[in-house]
Amino acid sequence: SGAQPKAAVVAGMVGVIAEINPKAVEVRHGQKWVDEVYTSLDELIPRIRQASANKEAVSLAYQGNIVDLWERLVTENIHVDLGSDQTSLHNPFAGGYYPVGLSFEEANRMMAEQPELFKEKVYESLRRHVKAINTMAARGMYFFDYGNAFLLESSRAGADILKPNGDFRYPSYVQDIMGPMFFDYGFGPFRWVCTSSDPKDLATTDAIALEVLEEIAKTAPAEIMGQLQDNIHWIREASKNNLVVGSQARILYADA
């Protein structure tokens, strides 16, 4: 979707996102939804180290296979704080997942001409995919499921994705992040759209939201102060990062 690189920059992080489809990379880079594009891991890895050392807020796209990226992060011993996966594994054999070892074009041909072999390649890739993630998690990375059937399809592939009791190794972001941090305290996703399509109207609504949040924060209990400060940061930074695609709209996880 392109939201991940923007989110990383807004949050002040170094975001690294893999995308195998060159057209998708070109579009997002052209829209300025990702800052830099790399086709070589030999060039990307030093850039990650540099950006981390300098504490940059920057998004880096790797035009290539996600498994190659994860495995290289393992061998290079790159520290990763947060990891996730957003491949469309609800549709693993018809374009939702591209297996490691095949180019974008090769995968598309095999998908159409040799579907059973392609399925085998997907499952082989998922086993390698999970192995690399498990290694990174053992080194301290927090990995979460994005609700995209990654855990389910990995289990079907025979990957090491289950705990001894049969539960998945990793939680979903709703279960482990959004629920405890937001929903349990009455915070929910509110959206508004400026039907005038005027950016000035969106700026006005941002200013109103910021004023309300700052007023609430003056007397808010400590257990929700972090959420409020995150929301204040979000509203302040949203317009600076050119997040609008289409309608002049905003989302805010506000306290109902």
Residue ranges and their predicted role:
Residues P22-K23, N65-V67, T87-H90, N148-L151:
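Short, glycine-/Ser/Thr-/acidic-enriched flexible segments
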Residues A18, L41, Y62, I66, ...:
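Active-site-proximal structural scaffolding
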Residues V9-A11, V74-I78, A159-L162:
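Short, solvent-exposed amphipathic alpha-helical segments in soluble enzyme
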Residues G2-A53, D85-K131, F168-F183:
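Catalytic or ion-translocation cores adjacent to nucleophile or general acid/base/metal-coordination motifs
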Residues I17, A61, L82-D85, Y142-N148:
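A structural signal for short, well-ordered beta-strand segments and their strand-loop junctions
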Residues N54, H79, R139-G140:
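Structured helix-beta-strand junction loops
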Residues S59-T87, A94:
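Active-site/ligand-binding-proximal alpha/beta "capping" segment
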Residues H90-A94, P99, E113-A256:
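Active-site loops and adjacent core secondary-structure elements that bind or stabilize anionic groups
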